[in-house]
């Protein structure tokens, strides 16, 4: 018969195996604009804005996600809606931890028997300190283990690319905070770059343009609506107009103006030019054989920013290679985590 020590060891082993079997395996796309979660065996279970509303008087959380996002620019003085992620990395550690913990509890991914294993995507070319901050924030929510993977690699996998072969695949992932550009072959990144220009900067470009040209102040949500529903950066129509409402900076009163498609192209031109320069620099660093693959296969765009009207034909014209948008650009990264889990 087993002695007491052996019996205890055996029981501990069974408990460990049970907990491991019960533990959920989770993929996070913790973006600047939105946070998406994929659970192995279940698929995408959460897609919410990366926003937390805090009562500044007592430091209590008022809302997280969709509810908090609706408060942006509309909160009373004591309530502040915060975006804790900036440029794809943590800008406010404490609020990020609160947000991750809230979402993990919302999807019931943690219980007294088990702690989840988490795969989190992060932009390429971020600093070791920034990587450690992302990992630590996830660990402090009760994760058993946390793994990091570079976003362009995961986006490519989520877009359906086979990156395992000795052939080049190129992806441009334009999210809320960063644009990640990478050429991949044999399951690794051959050359890459990451610029902190993406959807949120596009919004700020539109706000700045309208403020400077028309002395009209508009909010982030209005700017985002203009970007998504009206802006055009390739052969824009100067006759196509949109009414925009905001606050007149001279009188302080509500006011309405009209802007044209051509003006949106002008507002976004500098940021788009910087992205194209970064893409060109990556292509210039690519070995000739892999360059030939890209000419044949083209470039795949992922992320919400890839849906900017006119971006595909503009990139085709500037880069002289085929350019395509992934089938599900908004969810490529989190779907890629699902393949890797």
Please place each PLM-identified region on the residue numbering.
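Nucleotide/phosphate-binding catalytic cleft detector across ATP-hydrolyzing
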Residues: 1-174, 182-300, 306-341
């Amino acid at each position: 018969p087993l002695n007491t020590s052996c019996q205890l060891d055996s029981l501990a082993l069974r408990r460990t195996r049970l907990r491991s079997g019960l533990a959920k395996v989770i993929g996070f796309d913790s973006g600047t604009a939105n946070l998406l979660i994929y659970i192995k065996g279940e698929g995408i279970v959460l897609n919410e804005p990366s926003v937390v509303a805090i009562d500044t008087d007592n430091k209590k959380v008022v809302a997280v996600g969709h509810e908090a996002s609706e408060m942006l620019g509309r909160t009373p003085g004591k309530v502040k809606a915060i975006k804790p992620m900036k440029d794809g990395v943590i800008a406010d550690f404490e609020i990020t931890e609160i947000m991750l913990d809230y979402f993990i509890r919302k999807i019931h991914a943690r219980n007294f028997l088990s702690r989840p294993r988490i795969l989190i995507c992060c932009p390429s070319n971020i600093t070791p300190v920034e990587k450690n901050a992302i990992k630590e924030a996830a660990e402090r929510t009760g994760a058993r283990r946390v793994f990091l993977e570079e976003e362009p690699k995961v986006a490519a996998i989520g877009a359906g690319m086979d990156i395992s072969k000795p052939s080049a695949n190129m992806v441009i992932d334009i999210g809320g905070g960063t644009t990640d550009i990478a050429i991949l072959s044999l399951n690794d990144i051959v050359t890459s770059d990451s610029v902190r220009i993406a959807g949120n900067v596009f919004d700020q470009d539109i706000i700045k343009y309208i403020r400077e040209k028309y002395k009209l102040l508009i909010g982030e949500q209005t700017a985002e609506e203009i970007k998504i529903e009206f802006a055009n950066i390739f052969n824009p129509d100067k006759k196509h107009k949109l009414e925009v409402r905001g606050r007149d900076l001279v009188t302080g009163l509500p006011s309405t103006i009209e802007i044209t498609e051509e003006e949106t192209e002008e507002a976004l031109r500098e940021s788009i030019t910087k992205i194209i320069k970064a893409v060109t620099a990556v292509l210039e660093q690519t070995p000739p054989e892999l360059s030939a693959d890209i000419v044949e296969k083209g470039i795949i765009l992922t992320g919400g920013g890839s849906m900017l009207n006119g971006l595909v034909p503009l990139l085709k014209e500037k880069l002289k290679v085929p350019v395509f948008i992934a089938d599900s650009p908004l969810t490529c990264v989190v779907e890629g985590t699902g393949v890797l889990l």
